[in-house]
Amino acid sequence: MQAYQRDFIRFAIERGVLRFGEFTLKSGRTSPYFFNAGLFDSGLALARLGRFYAEAVIDSGIDFDVLFGPAYKGIPLAATTAVALAEQHRRDLPWCFNRKEAKDHGEGGTLVGAPLSGRVLIIDDVITAGTAIREVMQIIDAQGARAAGVLIALNRQERGKGELSAIQEVERDFGMPVVSIVSLEQVLEYLAGDAELKKHLPAVEAYRAQYGI
């Protein structure tokens, strides 16, 4: 695990974004942990989050021309990542996002920001079922651009209804990488090394054994 990944997990726990206990997911599964990126809900937290995304962008080595934030949660994530890449890494890159509803006045259309062209890096919080990413792929295709990859905050490394995770299905169906700031594997490593949080390790390991990929 890299230093920025360890720092991100600590930050997520401090913000209450990553919590341990008993949580019922949309899938109906009872999970021993929960990740809610909506709780990065202050200016300072969002700025710091952007720096973690930017580190993961650099670490991934993915070549791309524009950042894209899917409405709605991806919009501030793409914005803060673009700021951090410019300020911390001297990479001033264009970014854009979509509206859920088309406008028929002003600039019109469903896209806002830089032109959606060339190689597109999609920025989002998590991939649960992959439905949102499939919708984004239609938007990208319609603009004649192509997806270079997807960057999310956490990879749960968890099977869907079949043998693959939603992330693996996206990678297979679209032939592009999905990378994350951290994965469940790194969360387990963090728990194992933290005296106070180690008590949650058996439950998370058992969940991984049952649903993991």
UniProtKB/Swiss-Prot annotation:
Residues that, per the record, bind 5-phospho-alpha-D-ribose 1-diphosphate: 26, 72-73, 99-100, 103, 105, 124-132
InterPro entries: OPRT (IPR023031), Or_phspho_trans_dom (IPR004467), PRibTrfase_dom (IPR000836), PRTase-like (IPR029057)
Key word Magnesium present: yes
Keywords per UniProt: Glycosyltransferase, Magnesium, Pyrimidine biosynthesis, Transferase
PROSITE patterns noted in UniProt: PUR_PYR_PR_TRANSFER (PS00103)
Catalysed reactions, as listed in the record: orotidine 5'-phosphate + diphosphate = orotate + 5-phospho-alpha-D-ribose 1-diphosphate
Any Gene Ontology biological process: pyrimidine ribonucleoside biosynthetic process
Enzymatic class: transferase
SUPFAM superfamilies recorded: PRTase-like
Pathway per the UniProt entry: Pyrimidine metabolism; UMP biosynthesis via de novo pathway; UMP from orotate: step 1/2
Cofactor (UniProt): Mg(2+)
GO molecular function: magnesium ion binding; orotate phosphoribosyltransferase activity
Documented EC number(s): 2.4.2.10
Pfam family for this entry, one: Pribosyltran
Transferase listed as a keyword: yes
Positions that bind orotate: F34, F35, T128, R156
Superkingdom classification of source: Bacteria
Signal sequence region: none
NCBIfam families named among the record's database cross-references: pyrE
The family this protein is said to belong to: Belongs to the purine/pyrimidine phosphoribosyltransferase family. PyrE subfamily.
Subunit structure and binding partners: Homodimer.
Protein task: Catalyzes the transfer of a ribosyl phosphate group from 5-phosphoribose 1-diphosphate to orotate, leading to the formation of orotidine monophosphate (OMP).
Protein name, UniProt field: Orotate phosphoribosyltransferase
Organism: Pseudomonas paraeruginosa (strain DSM 24068 / PA7) (Pseudomonas aeruginosa (strain PA7))
Lineage: Bacteria, Pseudomonadati, Pseudomonadota, Gammaproteobacteria, Pseudomonadales
